[in-house]
Every structure is written in structure tokens, then in C-alpha cells.
């Protein structure tokens, strides 16, 4: 996946122990320092995606421990993108979504089924 060209409509998943970023319409993997105590960290991806896609970006944080995603969502909001988190009721762990909500960087809160529907509708 490293340096692979980004293809619209494709889902990319960061491999374990690698940060994923977007640079010049390609996937960039790195083993740079852990961020928020983790690698991969979604903050790395969101920050790079915000620079590339600005207001065309939709960032979603779903269930997870810690605060990863909050700083990245701040960048997404600053460049005009849209931010969504999974609701507390359908999250196994509400750490990541909850921290983003507390930081005030979330446009909408959806349950898991509504996130799936949204992604399905966007793909069409």
C-alpha cells in the first residue's frame, strides 16, 4: 500500500505499527514516533487528508480508547471539512468519539447504523 495511488471509492486500512498519511494523492506509510501513544494514529491521517481535500473531506471517528482523532478533526474543521462521531450508545468504548465531542470539533453524532447508511449513500 505504501505509495499506492488513491482510488476513489476504495477503503484503505493502516497496517499495524504504521501511520498512514496522504501525500500527492498517494498513501504514505511511516513508522515515525507514536502519537497519542499509538501507531497507527488517525490524527496523522486526518491532518494530511485535511491539507489535501479541505472542504471535500468527511472525517469519522468511531468507537475506540483514548483521544486519538481529536486533533485531526480540529484540522478537518479548520479546512472546512465535515466531522462525525459514533454515538455513545452504540460505541463499545466512547473514548475517542467522546473526546472529540468534548473538544467541540464534531458536526454530527450518529449511531452505527446511520454511519453505515451515510457511507452507503455517499458511495452512490
What are the residue ranges of the model-derived segments?
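Conserved acid/base catalytic micro-environments in cytosolic active-site loops
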Residues: 1-124
Amino acid at each position: 500500500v505504501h505509495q499506492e495511488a488513491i482510488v476513489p471509492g476504495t477503503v484503505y486500512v493502516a497496517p499495524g505499527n504504521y501511520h498512514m498519511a496522504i501525500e500527492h494523492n498517494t498513501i504514505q506509510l511511516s513508522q515515525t514516533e507514536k502519537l497519542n501513544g499509538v501507531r497507527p494514529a488517525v490524527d496523522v491521517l486526518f491532518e494530511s487528508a485535511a491539507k489535501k481535500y479541505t472542504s471535500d473531506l468527511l472525517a469519522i471517528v468511531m468507537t475506540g480508547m483514548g483521544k486519538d482523532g481529536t486533533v485531526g478533526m480540529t484540522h478537518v474543521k479548520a479546512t472546512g471539512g465535515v466531522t462525525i462521531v459514533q454515538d455513545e450508545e452504540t460505541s463499545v468504548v466512547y473514548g475517542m468519539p467522546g473526546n472529540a465531542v468534548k473538544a467541540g470539533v464534531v458536526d454530527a453524532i450518529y449511531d452505527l447504523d446511520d454511519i453505515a447508511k451515510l457511507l452507503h449513500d455517499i458511495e452512490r
